[in-house]
C-alpha cells in the first residue's frame, strides 16, 4: 500500500471515528444562538475578519425564512456552526450576493437555485485538537444541496483556503482572485460549467 493511500485511509478512519460522536442540529433557540455567537466571536476575533459588535455576530439574516443555522456538536458540546441560505430566483437573500451581486444574479436570472453557506465558525480550542472540523461542518452544505435539489453550492473563500475547496469540493473560481474571491462547486462534481 502506498504512503499516500495509507494516509488517506488513516484520515478517513479517523473521520469516521469522530462522526460516531457528532450530532448535527438546527439552531433555533435563543440559548443555542448565544452559543453560536460565542463561537463566532472567538473564531472571528482570532481570524480578524469581522467587526466584533453584537449586531455582526447574530443578525436579522440568521432568522430569515430561508436561512438555516446549524450547529455541529461533539459529545453534546457545540464545536462549530454554519449558516445555510437557500437562495432562489424569488428569494435572493444571501451574504455572498451582497458581496458579488452581478455574479450571483447571473445564476439566479438563469433560474438556478443556490446553497450559500456562510458564517462558518469553529471553536478554536477544539480546532487545534480536531482539524477535521471544516470537513464535518461543510458537509452540511452538500446535504442542503441534495435536500433542496440546488444547482450550485457557493463559498466565499480566502486565497489561503482555495486549494482545500478545489481538492475537497471540486471548486471552480467564478470571481477572479482579488481582494475577495469566490468559488462554487456542483453537488454532483461532474465538472460541467454553466453560468
Feature-to-residue mapping (PLM):
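A short acidic/small-residue loop/turn micro-motif
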Residues: 86-88
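Beta-rich nucleic-acid/ligand-interaction surfaces
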Residues: 58-63, 160-163
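Acidic, low-complexity proline/glycine-rich segments
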Residues: 1-9
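Acyl-donor binding region in acyl/amide transferases
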Residues: 91, 95-191
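Short amphipathic alpha-helix that is part of the acyltransferase structural core
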Residues: 10-59, 69-73, 78
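Short glycine-/small-residue motifs
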Residues: 81
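A short helix-loop-beta-strand connector motif used in the catalytic cores of GNAT acetyltransferases and
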Residues: 61-71, 91-93
